[in-house]
Amino acid sequence: MLADAPGELAKLTEILKNEHINIEAMNIQDANEYLMALYECRSQTGRRVAPRDYYEAILKESAKYSMIRFITDNPDKAVDVLNSVGYKVKLENVIGLVLQNRPGLLNRVAKAFGDAGINIAYTYGAGFSDGVSALFIFKVSEMEKALEMFPNGIIE
């Protein structure tokens, strides 16, 4: 989590820069926005598991933070360094796939995961400056199975 305030990303990236750790991919999401969407989904289904006051307290607290996910060239060192200066960091296994930048390839990957019974917890991606390919990061329910499906990490 990252404090939702001006300059916080600069502080975090300064720490990584000073340790010669490169960020290769990153996603930042407003924690409050995410939780509000979840709250609204729960309202529609009627499956709230806690009193309304509990949800409202969490929403109020979440307004102070953003969720940040990033890939570095040295994840273990990044976790150690950031934890040592007070950030709460968790290492997660993800799979990175390079897709040719054309319609339908992300669908092919998503369909392959679904057909194999692999759930996608989250994904984020962006095109490379060459305009030919894009990198997508996936957090999936069955990492080993996903790696077997796409062993070279390139989808053409």
Model segments located where?
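A conserved regulatory-domain signal marking ACT and ACT-like small-molecule sensing domains
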Residues: 1-156
